[in-house]
Design a protein with these regions (language model features):
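Short Pro/Gly-enriched beta-strand edge/turn motifs at strand-loop
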Residues: 56-61, 68-69, 144-149, 324-329
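N-terminal short leaders/motifs
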Residues: 15-45, 114-130, 161-169, 270-309
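C-terminal catalytic domain of Rieske-type non-heme iron oxygenases
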Residues: 94, 166-167, 171-439
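N-terminal pre-ligand scaffold of iron-sulfur
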Residues: 2-113, 165-166
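Rieske [2Fe-2S] iron-sulfur-binding domain
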Residues: 66-178, 182-193
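Short hydrophobic core segments
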Residues: 49, 101-102, 127, 220, ...
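Short linear motifs in intrinsically disordered
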Residues: 62-69, 154-155, 320-324, 358
Length: 439
């Protein structure tokens, strides 16, 4: 079993969720047999995912810091949901999202040089490039070019189509399904409840990277949901002696947990700072930073012991990081040295997706701290490149259909859960939309 259960107690967060004699997979009542990756190589299944998942679940599209003032906006391309949205802070200070489409002839409303590229800015109103229809920041149609030429048009009926929008701890979510009445906080479940109060608002130094990956979106989530591969694929990121030790002993998690469609893994973090400086590379010794972030944790207003209960749920002394997957495609990683990393996986086809990584730090107070953060950010980019390259090789061979059954170990329990969840959403959608039987 990966990790060791702690003693019991009434607090569900501060005890290991795994019983002493069971594997994690069996504990969560997940089948332990070989799995198929047919859901990752099928164009037909991807089309079902678009309607069953991405048009019906809460999707994280950004943070409130991207909208610092009234009139601030950004657009988000949601190819998997067949949509583009514009997210804006209104004159009343509220954050809203609208379908990015003009009500006149369906032109994309907000874009710059290239319609498929995302954009951002500040404005007093949105004006269509095609015929100059204008909308205020709350989506109301305020101007129609040559309005008298239309046949009794009621402009009050042609405002922008609003999208359900809610904010959790500064993260902006949208839901494209007008019939979905589940509040965001309810959907995010116990993990969000247990993270409430973490000072995300203090982490305003942002580093972003983006890549177009030639693999199914779920395969990249799989890569970051297990550490089984880390000692092998990423061996070059460690000093040779440390790499050999990690390869010998493996890299196991402290605990796993599942809540509905969502999941999390809690991990040790012994190299921030390392017990011995010989474990890390010279640049890491000089800058006191690396894979687990800057070694000198900034003040965020709470100690490690005071973190919200879902973070380091076993309260293990060697804890280093927790990784939460909020289904379908938002991964939130909270690190012991007081910084945060998010991953987003935006499908563009059954075998391609856009991967976004964003590092959030407390703003540096001097040049040295800025370099510490830069090293952490570029270190993660290197890890991402190694994973992305490998996943493109995986996708190619899965599509050969030479092998269709794959054994997974206990450390890969969250992979099973992700694919089971995806297939469950698709099955439910198919059943709900099946034609009624004829008499």
């Amino acid at each position: 079993v990966a990790g060791s259960p702690l003693s019991g107690g009434s607090d569900p967060w501060h005890t290991s969720p795994s019983p002493p004699r069971a594997s994690w997979t069996e504990h969560f009542k997940i089948d332990t047999g070989p799995v198929s990756y047919a859901d990752s190589i099928s164009p037909e299944f991807y089309e079902l995912e678009r309607d069953a998942i991405f048009r019906r679940t809460w999707l994280n599209v950004g943070r409130v810091e991207q909208l610092p003032r009234k009139g601030s906006y950004f657009t988000k391309e949601l190819d998997a949901a067949r949509a583009s949205v514009v997210v804006v802070r209104g004159t009343d200070g509220e954050v809203r999202a609208f379908h990015n489409v003009c009500r006149h002839r369906g032109n994309k409303l907000v874009w710059d040089d290239y319609p498929r590229e995302e954009t951002k800015g500040t404005c007093r109103a949105f004006t269509c490039k095609y015929h100059a229809w204008r909308y205020d920041l709350e989506g109301k149609l305020t101007f129609v070019q040559q309005e008298s030429e239309f046949f009794g048009i009621d402009t009050s009926k042609y405002g922008l189509m609003q999208v359900q929008t809610e904010v959790w701890e500064g993260f902006i979510f949208v839901n494209l399904d007008p019939e979905n009445t589940t509040p965001l906080k309810t959907y995010l479940g116990k993990f969000a409840q247990g993270i409430d109060g973490y000072p995300f608002h203090k982490l305003t130094q942002v580093h972003k990277y983006r890549a177009e990956i030639g693999s199914n979106w779920k395969l990249f989530i799989d890569a970051f949901a297990e550490f089984y591969h880390a000692p092998i694929l990423h061996a070059g990121q460690y000093e040779s002696g440390e790499a050999a030790k990690i390869k010998k002993y493996g890299y196991e998690a402290l605990s796993y947990d599942i809540d509905g469609p969502h999941s999390m893994v809690s991990s040790w973090g012994g190299i921030a700072p390392p017990k011995e400086k010989a474990m890390v590379k010279p640049i890491e010794r000089v800058l006191r930073s690396g894979l687990f972030g800057p070694w000198d944790a900034p003040d965020i207003g709470m100690t490690t012991e005071e973190l919200p209960p879902a973070i380091n749920p076993t309260r293990n002394e060697v804890w280093g990081m927790d990784s939460f997957v909020f289904f379908p495609n938002f991964m939130l990683l909270i690190w012991r040295p007081n910084w945060v990393l998010t991953y987003h996986y935006w499908p563009t086809s059954y075998n391609t997706h856009i991967f976004e990584g964003t590092c959030y730090f407390v703003p540096p107070e001097n040049g040295f701290q800025r370099l510490q953060q830069e090293l952490a950010a570029v270190t993660f980019k290197e890890y991402g490149l190694q994973d992305g390259n490998t996943l493109e090789a995986t996708q190619t061979m899965l599509e050969s259909r030479t092998v269709d059954q794959f054994p997974l170990c206990d450390q890969e329990v969250l992979l099973r859960h992700l694919h089971n969840t995806t297939q469950s959403y698709v099955r439910e959608y198919q059943q709900r939309n099946a034609p009624a039987p004829t008499s």
